[in-house]
From Swiss-Prot:
Sequence segments annotated as region (Disordered): 197-225
Provenance organism: Escherichia coli O157:H7
Protein name: Chromosome partition protein MukE
Function: Involved in chromosome condensation, segregation and cell cycle progression. May participate in facilitating chromosome segregation by condensation DNA from both sides of a centrally located replisome during cell division. Probably acts via its interaction with MukB and MukF.
Pfam family membership, one: MukE
Family membership noted in the UniProt record: Belongs to the MukE family.
CDD domains associated with the record: MukE (cd16336)
Length: 225
C-alpha cells in the first residue's frame, strides 16, 4: 500500500468522510477540512475507491463525489423524478441574481413558487398522485413531497439549512450536478430554464444516487448556526 494512501486511511477525518461519500454526499468548499483532505489525497483515494468500482470525481466547480459504475460494490438508489426536478430548480436559483441579493439564502416557499412557475403543475401533481384532479389536497401533498425532496438533497450536500430553521437554506455549488449543458455563448440561467421547461432528461451518468441504508439515519450535520 502506498505510504500516502496509508496516511489517508489512518487520518481521523477518513471514517466519517468515507461514510458520507458512500452515502452519496457531495463535499464542497464549505466543508473546509474534508475538502482540503480530499484535495491532498485525491490521487491515492481515486485508486482506493476504484477497487469498489466507483470513481472519486472532482467536478469543475470544485466539489467531490463518488460516481458508481454499473458493477459498483456500494449499495445505491436513484433519486425520484421529483427529487431531480427540485434539484434543477435549485440550480436555477443558484444562477439567479436573487442569490446575491439575498446573501445566498432562500426559503422553501420561494423554491415551491419557482417550481410552479417553471414546471408544468399538472405533471408535478401526477408525480404525487397519478389520479390527481388538481385539488387543494393534491397541492398540499405536492408541497410536502417537495419538502421531502429538499431534505433528501440536503443529505447529498446540495443545500445547508440555516441553523434549526429548515424553512430557510443556502444552496451549494453541488447543484451543478443538475445543471444544463451550456454551449459557448449561451446564458447559463436561460439554458437551465429550458432544461426545466422542456422536461429534458439528464444523462445517465449524471443520475444522482443515495445509499438507502443511511438516508434515514444520517445526522442533521448539514446545518449552519
Amino acid at each position: 500500500m502506498p505510504v500516502k494512501l496509508a496516511q489517508a486511511l489512518a487520518n481521523p477525518l477518513f471514517p466519517a468522510l468515507d461514510s458520507a461519500l458512500r452515502s452519496g454526499r457531495h463535499i464542497g468548499l464549505d466543508e473546509l477540512d474534508n475538502h482540503a483532505f480530499l484535495m491532498d489525497f485525491q490521487e491515492y483515494l481515486e485508486e482506493f475507491y476504484a477497487r469498489y468500482n466507483v470513481e472519486l470525481i472532482r467536478a469543475p466547480e470544485g466539489f467531490f463525489y463518488l460516481r458508481p459504475r454499473s458493477t459498483t460494490l456500494i449499495p445505491r438508489s436513484v433519486l425520484s423524478e421529483l427529487d431531480m426536478m427540485v434539484g434543477k430548480i435549485l440550480c436555477y436559483l443558484y444562477l439567479s441574481p436573487e442569490r446575491l441579493a439575498n446573501e445566498g439564502i432562500f426559503t422553501q416557499q420561494e423554491l415551491y413558487d419557482e417550481l410552479l412557475t417553471l414546471a408544468d403543475e399538472a405533471k408535478l401533481l401526477k408525480l404525487v398522485n397519478n389520479r390527481s384532479t388538481g385539488s387543494d389536497i393534491d397541492r398540499q401533498k405536492l408541497q410536502e413531497k417537495v419538502r421531502s425532496s429538499l431534505n433528501r438533497l440536503r443529505r447529498l450536500g446540495m443545500v445547508w439549512f440555516m441553523g434549526h430553521d429548515s424553512s430557510k437554506f443556502r444552496i451549494t455549488e453541488s447543484v451543478f450536478r443538475f445543471g444544463a449543458d451550456v454551449r459557448a455563448g449561451d446564458d447559463p440561467r436561460e439554458a437551465q430554464r429550458r432544461l426545466i421547461r422542456d422536461g429534458e432528461a439528464m444523462p445517465i451518468e449524471n443520475h444522482l444516487q443515495l445509499n438507502d441504508e443511511t438516508e434515514e439515519n444520517q445526522p442533521d450535520s448539514g446545518e449552519e448556526e
